[in-house]
């Protein structure tokens, strides 16, 4: 795709986003709200919490090990659902009356022994104290950044997220009180030689009260959502707009579809523009490299683009469970780099430390900061301060690359 994308005079790419009331996103937020509660009591808690939901029911399951404090899980679940907006049976789900089942047990000691004491520590090969912490699992993680938007994200996913955030704002502030929590957006961007030039298609599906006409919903969402979030220069007479194309979206949330933590990993990351290692984020403490290393790779990628080393970059890092040092690190700049890729890779290795313990330290990840990432995307956020979105290694990278 990269060569076609960069060399084609006309190329289309589509990304989607979903609202906080989407059943899968509900589950992500519940899992991360529970994670935050455990980290508030014990910053070194080991947490792997999954959530499932269907009509009238939420199930929380997983593995947790922590030192102290009572965690009122059912209360956290109901509060999270209420904050999302499911406060009445009219919406198909009610935070106060839904069933909540909890099935949580301790982390496997076989896993814990590899995280508590890395292989480097066991064989006496530690370079420093950071190598006492092993990766919580094997796997590969990716990070990406590009210069298409101010937040250094692909235009299609950035716009899809903006539409959803605006949709949630007008629902909650009373501008469009008939809207309900479940919604999805989708944006197709037209590119010319790797640069976004216009929006070809906008799709929004939003749950709504039963007495609102399709014509009113369409007019309101175009005026209060689409026109406020998509640059005017990118909309033209040929832009196609679809609003609730089925004609009706009254039944939504868990009543319309079951939900599960970790089923929106492309929404959470780069909208399909970059590759994905397959591991979900929500409900996992930072010892799980599925989450922490993906955050670190985004941090590295964003600093590379901000430093002017490349206009577009993707990184891959890989780990073995119980081993501190990454197994591999690669950089791909798709022909957009100011210096050779091997120079960028060398600079990254000089400036960034991608061992799990160092990632946790440098990004200060043992804090209750995760619930707010669980809807609206984990990357490119301009509404919240996330450590992996900071471009605080730009000058170091430029020096290391000889610029």
Curated annotation (Swiss-Prot):
It catalyses: L-methionine + ATP + H2O = S-adenosyl-L-methionine + phosphate + diphosphate. Residues 107-117 are annotated as: Flexible loop. L-methionine binds at residues 63, 107, 257, 288. ATP binds at residues 22, 182-184, 248-249, 257, 263-264, 280, 284. It is found in: Cytoplasm. Pathway: Amino-acid biosynthesis; S-adenosyl-L-methionine biosynthesis; S-adenosyl-L-methionine from L-methionine: step 1/1. Gene3D superfamilies: 3.30.300.10. Keywords: ATP-binding, Cytoplasm, Magnesium, Metal-binding, Nucleotide-binding, One-carbon metabolism, Potassium, Transferase. PROSITE patterns: ADOMET_SYNTHASE_1, ADOMET_SYNTHASE_2. Binds 2 divalent ions per subunit. Binds 1 potassium ion per subunit. One of its GO terms (biological process) is S-adenosylmethionine biosynthetic process. K(+) binds at residue 50. One of its GO terms (cellular component) is cytosol. Mg(2+) binds at residue 24. SUPFAM superfamilies: S-adenosylmethionine synthetase. It is an enzyme of class 2 (transferase). Its cofactor is Mg(2+); K(+). Belongs to the AdoMet synthase family. HAMAP family: S_AdoMet_synth1 (MF_00086). Homotetramer; dimer of dimers. Catalyzes the formation of S-adenosylmethionine (AdoMet) from methionine and ATP. The overall synthetic reaction is composed of two sequential steps, AdoMet formation and the subsequent tripolyphosphate hydrolysis which occurs prior to release of AdoMet from the enzyme. This is S-adenosylmethionine synthase. It comes from Chloroflexus aurantiacus (strain ATCC 29366 / DSM 635 / J-10-fl). The gene is metK.
